[in-house]
Structure formats: structure tokens, C-alpha cells
Amino acid sequence: MKLAVVVQRYGAEINGGAELHARYVAEHLARHHEVEVVTTCARDYVTWRNEWPAGEDTINGVRERRFPVRRERDPHDFGRRSQVVFEQPHSVADELAWLESEGPTSPALVRYVASRDAGFDFAFFFSARYYHAWHGARAM
């Protein structure tokens, strides 16, 4: 079975909650299945700046594929949209705009996960609050 573990950041030195959980899941599943981690080139969860090169690598025996983030987070825009979504009546369109503003926004990552060429039988998305999880799950 070919599995995708899709997470906003990935690496041996990334110790965030969802990111570390995703790494543990990927490493465990890779003992029994073909696993590919699909992630962004971002290292910093505040800026989402592209710091790693796009492309493929192997970390702890797990194949990883990185995609660029389209743009860094604008903290003022994100703060304004967060205030609307968390403190005011709002629409689904407002929530989707917040999701885009929060980042990391990587349409190429979403296209890849959903493509027939990738050939995934199943995908695990970490975490639901991010662009790649919402759009990736809907695209599959």
C-alpha cells in the first residue's frame, strides 16, 4: 500500500506537536508500507519562509518530497482575519480567506497529493487547520 503523510513542516529537527507526531507515524508505517512524506520547504511556522530546497530526500529511511510555499505569512493580514474568524460573525468565505492567510499555502503540494501520478492509496493529513489539509483532503 502506498501512503502519503502530508504535513506543513517535516524534518528530524522539527519538534512541533503535529510535525513530530507525523514523523513518528511515517517512520512506523514505513516498516510495513511504502510511505512518502509530502511537505513544504518551510522551516519556520511563523513566517512560512521557504528555507529548504524543493525536491526529494530521505529522512530516517522515509522518503520526503518538499514543495515551495507560495508566499510568506503577512502577520498584519493574518491578525486581522483571525480577529474576524474568532471574534465576529463570519462566513465560510471568511474562514477560507483566513486559511489562505495563515499558510503555508502550497498549491503545488495539493496538486501533487491529489494527482493520479502520485498513486497514493491513502493520505494522512496533519493538521486540519492548515491549507494543505483542507484543500488536499477535498482534492482527493
Language-model features and meaning:
Residues 40-117:
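A conserved catalytic-core segment of Leloir-type glycosyltransferases
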Residues 41, 126-129:
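Short, well-ordered beta-to-alpha junction loops that form the rim of enzyme active sites
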